[in-house]
Amino acid sequence: MQLPRNPFKAALDGDTRYGCWAGFATGYAAEILATTGFDWLLIDGEHAPNIVPTTLAQLQALAAYPCAPVVRTVNHDPALIKQLLDIGTQTLMIPMVDTAEQAAQLVAATRYPPHGFRGVGGGLTRATRWGAVEDYMAQAHEELCLIVQVESRSGVDNAEAIAATPGVDAIFVGPFDLSTETGHIGDPTHPEVQAMIRHTLDATHAAGKAAGILAPAEADARRYAQWGFDFIAVGIDISLLRQAAMETVSRYKG
């Protein structure tokens, strides 16, 4: 059996890809989103109540659809990274990366020795299709896409070095954490924050890597697309449900 291709990684050098945050932590909700036309979904393990089994259920639900899953971890824990890779995650997003040294350690956590220190699960893992994928350990890195998040002043200052780290495929900017750290809470459109976002984008592209960002507001998303961001999350499932519910109720209750 051949190693499954990673459609998210394959599409990074094409047109802007639009995605949605998936926070309900169920395969049922993720599968509904997969039918709507989004190019990718972020299965959020940082702020949503996801654990390894719920992430697995969502990966399985999305497998039948042309909607690529991206899995975000809660932290930099190599043991968790190993588990997420073993259940078949091919595109992994890691939050709060501030230095190239951190980025290099994360790359190593996704690679087998001698190029890293990922543990060997063999036939126990969905990633190998329980041993059916030939030469999995030798080629797994080819379809792995590692995205690191820059969402602090330190990360922005080190964006060039982070982006240049071998094995890092993309940088994802966290505009809301950036705006909070700089004292512009809830205002990622503040000129200071916008300048930091633009700097990170330029540094990422200068290194030949892809850049992504979260932009639930349409005006922001369109501006970032014009700037050249390669992948943009334009919605959050929980927010979309709440907004639709509020609009429905308001039509009847005023």
UniProtKB/Swiss-Prot annotation:
Highest taxon of source: Bacteria
Cofactor(s) named in the record: a divalent metal cation
Molecular-function annotations in GO: aldehyde-lyase activity; metal ion binding
One protein family per Pfam: HpcH_HpaI
Keyword DNA damage: no
Family according to the record: Belongs to the HpcH/HpaI aldolase family.
Record-given protein name: Hydroxypyruvate/pyruvate aldolase
Classification lineage: Bacteria, Pseudomonadati, Pseudomonadota, Gammaproteobacteria, Oceanospirillales
